[in-house]
Amino acid sequence: MKYLTRLLSKFWLFLNYEKNDFYLGGPMRNYPDLNAPLFSSVSHMLRIKGFKVWNPSEHGSYLDTSFAKCMTDDLTAIIRDCRKIALLPGWQKSLGANMEAFVAFACGKEAVEVVMSENGASCELIPFDLSKYLLPYDGVNTSKFNPHEE
Protein backbone atom coordinates (compact mmCIF):
# COMPACT_ATOMS: atom_id res chain seq x y z
CA MET A 1 0.00 0.00 0.00
CA LYS A 2 2.86 2.38 0.84
CA TYR A 3 4.39 1.77 -2.62
CA LEU A 4 1.05 2.44 -4.34
CA THR A 5 0.62 5.69 -2.39
CA ARG A 6 4.09 6.89 -3.47
CA LEU A 7 3.43 5.89 -7.07
CA LEU A 8 0.09 7.72 -7.15
CA SER A 9 1.71 10.78 -5.58
CA LYS A 10 4.42 10.88 -8.27
CA PHE A 11 1.81 10.38 -11.00
CA TRP A 12 -0.26 13.28 -9.60
CA LEU A 13 2.83 15.51 -9.60
CA PHE A 14 3.54 14.50 -13.20
CA LEU A 15 -0.02 15.35 -14.30
CA ASN A 16 0.06 18.70 -12.52
CA TYR A 17 3.59 19.69 -13.53
CA GLU A 18 3.71 23.17 -15.01
CA LYS A 19 6.71 24.35 -16.96
CA ASN A 20 8.18 27.76 -16.38
CA ASP A 21 7.29 30.36 -18.98
CA PHE A 22 10.86 31.68 -19.05
CA TYR A 23 14.40 30.71 -18.18
CA LEU A 24 16.50 33.83 -17.51
CA GLY A 25 19.78 33.74 -19.41
CA GLY A 26 22.40 36.39 -18.88
CA PRO A 27 25.91 37.19 -17.70
CA MET A 28 26.88 36.23 -14.15
CA ARG A 29 30.62 35.63 -13.86
CA ASN A 30 32.80 38.72 -13.35
CA TYR A 31 29.81 40.73 -12.08
CA PRO A 32 29.38 41.85 -8.46
CA ASP A 33 27.12 39.36 -6.65
CA LEU A 34 27.06 37.33 -9.90
CA ASN A 35 24.63 39.88 -11.37
CA ALA A 36 21.96 38.62 -8.94
CA PRO A 37 20.34 42.09 -8.57
CA LEU A 38 19.51 42.19 -12.31
CA PHE A 39 18.29 38.58 -12.36
CA SER A 40 16.13 39.20 -9.27
CA SER A 41 14.74 42.46 -10.60
CA VAL A 42 13.73 40.97 -13.96
CA SER A 43 12.28 37.82 -12.42
CA HIS A 44 10.22 40.00 -10.05
CA MET A 45 8.93 42.15 -12.94
CA LEU A 46 7.96 39.07 -14.96
CA ARG A 47 6.28 37.36 -12.02
CA ILE A 48 4.19 40.49 -11.38
CA LYS A 49 3.01 40.15 -15.00
CA GLY A 50 1.91 36.59 -14.22
CA PHE A 51 4.81 34.66 -15.74
CA LYS A 52 6.42 31.66 -14.11
CA VAL A 53 10.21 32.22 -14.14
CA TRP A 54 13.25 29.99 -13.60
CA ASN A 55 15.95 32.30 -12.27
CA PRO A 56 19.36 30.56 -12.10
CA SER A 57 20.54 32.91 -9.34
CA GLU A 58 17.82 31.43 -7.11
CA HIS A 59 18.99 27.84 -7.61
CA GLY A 60 22.04 26.61 -5.77
CA SER A 61 25.08 28.58 -4.71
CA TYR A 62 27.02 29.76 -7.72
CA LEU A 63 29.84 30.78 -5.40
CA ASP A 64 30.41 27.20 -4.24
CA THR A 65 29.78 25.37 -7.51
CA SER A 66 31.93 24.75 -10.57
CA PHE A 67 31.05 26.32 -13.91
CA ALA A 68 30.43 22.80 -15.30
CA LYS A 69 27.94 21.95 -12.54
CA CYS A 70 26.14 25.29 -12.97
CA MET A 71 25.88 24.79 -16.72
CA THR A 72 24.63 21.22 -16.30
CA ASP A 73 21.87 22.39 -13.96
CA ASP A 74 20.99 25.41 -16.08
CA LEU A 75 20.91 23.58 -19.41
CA THR A 76 18.79 20.83 -17.87
CA ALA A 77 16.33 23.48 -16.70
CA ILE A 78 16.17 24.98 -20.19
CA ILE A 79 15.60 21.60 -21.83
CA ARG A 80 13.18 20.14 -19.31
CA ASP A 81 11.56 22.89 -17.28
CA CYS A 82 11.07 25.99 -19.44
CA ARG A 83 9.07 26.94 -22.50
CA LYS A 84 11.16 29.96 -23.59
CA ILE A 85 14.39 31.74 -22.80
CA ALA A 86 14.52 35.42 -21.81
CA LEU A 87 17.95 36.89 -22.57
CA LEU A 88 19.10 39.62 -20.20
CA PRO A 89 21.17 42.66 -21.19
CA GLY A 90 24.78 41.69 -21.89
CA TRP A 91 23.99 38.06 -22.74
CA GLN A 92 25.91 38.23 -26.05
CA LYS A 93 29.22 38.69 -24.20
CA SER A 94 28.65 35.78 -21.81
CA LEU A 95 29.91 32.31 -22.73
CA GLY A 96 27.37 30.68 -20.41
CA ALA A 97 24.43 32.70 -21.73
CA ASN A 98 25.50 31.94 -25.30
CA MET A 99 25.46 28.23 -24.50
CA GLU A 100 22.03 28.62 -22.91
CA ALA A 101 20.73 30.47 -25.98
CA PHE A 102 22.15 27.83 -28.30
CA VAL A 103 20.64 24.94 -26.34
CA ALA A 104 17.28 26.73 -26.26
CA PHE A 105 17.51 27.17 -30.03
CA ALA A 106 18.57 23.56 -30.62
CA CYS A 107 15.56 22.40 -28.58
CA GLY A 108 13.15 24.60 -30.54
CA LYS A 109 12.45 27.06 -27.73
CA GLU A 110 11.37 30.61 -28.45
CA ALA A 111 13.52 33.51 -27.25
CA VAL A 112 12.97 37.08 -26.16
CA GLU A 113 15.47 39.78 -25.28
CA VAL A 114 14.81 41.72 -22.10
CA VAL A 115 15.13 45.46 -22.68
CA MET A 116 15.27 47.51 -19.49
CA SER A 117 13.77 50.98 -19.18
CA GLU A 118 16.24 53.82 -18.59
CA ASN A 119 15.50 53.91 -14.86
CA GLY A 120 15.50 50.10 -14.57
CA ALA A 121 11.99 50.07 -13.10
CA SER A 122 10.41 48.13 -15.95
CA CYS A 123 11.33 45.88 -18.83
CA GLU A 124 10.03 44.99 -22.25
CA LEU A 125 10.24 41.57 -23.90
CA ILE A 126 11.29 41.75 -27.55
CA PRO A 127 11.00 38.56 -29.66
CA PHE A 128 14.45 37.39 -30.76
CA ASP A 129 15.03 34.95 -33.63
CA LEU A 130 17.84 32.68 -32.46
CA SER A 131 18.22 31.21 -35.97
CA LYS A 132 19.65 34.56 -37.11
CA TYR A 133 22.26 34.63 -34.35
CA LEU A 134 25.86 33.90 -35.32
CA LEU A 135 27.72 31.78 -32.83
CA PRO A 136 30.60 33.62 -31.13
CA TYR A 137 33.92 32.53 -29.64
CA ASP A 138 35.57 31.51 -32.90
CA GLY A 139 38.06 34.33 -33.10
CA VAL A 140 37.36 36.56 -36.09
CA ASN A 141 35.16 34.03 -37.84
CA THR A 142 31.69 33.26 -36.65
CA SER A 143 29.70 30.27 -37.74
CA LYS A 144 26.05 29.89 -38.43
CA PHE A 145 24.43 26.61 -37.48
CA ASN A 146 20.75 25.76 -37.65
CA PRO A 147 19.92 22.20 -36.54
CA HIS A 148 16.35 22.73 -37.73
CA GLU A 149 17.29 23.20 -41.39
CA GLU A 150 17.54 20.20 -43.70
Range-by-range predicted roles:
Residues 2-150:
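Conserved catalytic or regulatory cores that recognize and/or transform ribose-phosphate-containing ligands
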